[in-house]
Amino acid sequence: MATRPSSLVDSLEDEEDPQTLRRERSGSPRPRKIPRNALTQPVDQLLKDLRKNPSMISDPDQRTGREQLSNDELIKKLVTELAENSMIEAEEVRGTLGDISARIEAGFESLSALQVETIQTAQRCDHSDSIRILGENIKILDRSMKTMMETMKLMMEKVDLLYASTAVGTSAPMLPSHPAPPRIYPQLPSAPTADEWDIIP
């Protein structure tokens, strides 16, 4: 025969709250195994797959229905923000590339005009001292133009690398790697050297 509790308080203290029992979870959540093909497929395809099935990178077995729904919505929002940010950055890079190309072309035109003016000035000059000074200036200008051309080449290579790293995962067309066709990288006409002018140093 079961013994009765000494008081009603004792009987309540001995009972366990069923809500507490249901909330207890054993062990830590198991890590979700990402499919192997997700590591090799393109970024844009992976973003599309994540939009359709956010649970592919989470473990729904360890969550309630409401928790899993909240988790899926959060993943969808994050994926959408990543895609939008990537597209915005690609547009900014394309605009920057256009500005750089225009500035480089304008710089080359200015250098060409300066070279032509120098040559015309030398042709109109009859004094040997002035011709010698102009010849030295042409040599300096030629060295400066060569240095600037090398700098422009390095800049274009860096821009290509920046564009390639930013345009991954978007539909932006990739620029060709350096060297590129003349329509993108204008070619500066070669300047005559001092030997071709028969300038005596």
UniProtKB/Swiss-Prot annotation:
Key words of the record: Host cytoplasm, Host nucleus, Host-virus interaction, Inhibition of host innate immune response by virus, Inhibition of host RLR pathway by virus, Phosphoprotein, Viral immunoevasion
Family annotation (InterPro entries):
BDV_P24
Which segments does the entry list as coiled coil?
Answer: none
Q: What is its main location?
A: host cell
- Post-translational changes noted in the entry: Phosphorylated by host PKC epsilon and casein kinase II.
Q: Where in the cell is it found?
A: Host nucleus; Host cytoplasm
Show where the record puts the motif Nuclear localization signal 2. Answer: 181-193
Q: What is the effect of changing residue 24 to K?
A: In strain: Giessen
Gene Ontology BP annotations: symbiont-mediated suppression of host innate immune response
Keyword set includes Phosphoprotein: yes
Q: Where is this motif: Nuclear localization signal 1?
A: 29-36
Any transmembrane segments, and where? none
Q: Where is the stretch described as Disordered?
A: 1-70
Q: What Gene Ontology terms describe where this protein resides (cellular component)? A: host cell cytoplasm; host cell nucleus
Q: Quaternary arrangement and interactors, per the entry?
A: Homomultimer; only active in its oligomeric state. Interacts with nucleoprotein/N. Interacts with matrix/M protein. Interacts with host TBK1. Interacts with polymerase L. Interacts with host HMGB1; this interaction is required to stabilize RNP on chromosomes.
Q: What does this protein do?
A: Essential component of the RNA polymerase transcription and replication complex. Acts as a scaffold which brings L in close proximity to the N-RNA complex. Plays a role in the segregation of the viral genome in host daughter cells during mitosis by interacting with host HMGB1, a host chromatin-remodeling DNA architectural protein, thereby stabilizing RNP on chromosomes. Interacts with host TBK1 and thus interferes with activation of cellular antiviral state. Inhibits cellular histone acetyltransferase activities.
Q: What else is known?
A: The P/X gene has two overlapping open reading frames. One encodes the P protein and the other the X protein. The P (p24), X and P'(p16) proteins are produced by ribosomal leaky scanning.
Protein name from the UniProt record: Phosphoprotein
Instruction: Give the organism, scientific name.
Output: Borna disease virus 1 (BoDV-1)
The taxonomic lineage of its organism, from the top, reads: Viruses, Riboviria, Orthornavirae, Negarnaviricota, Haploviricotina
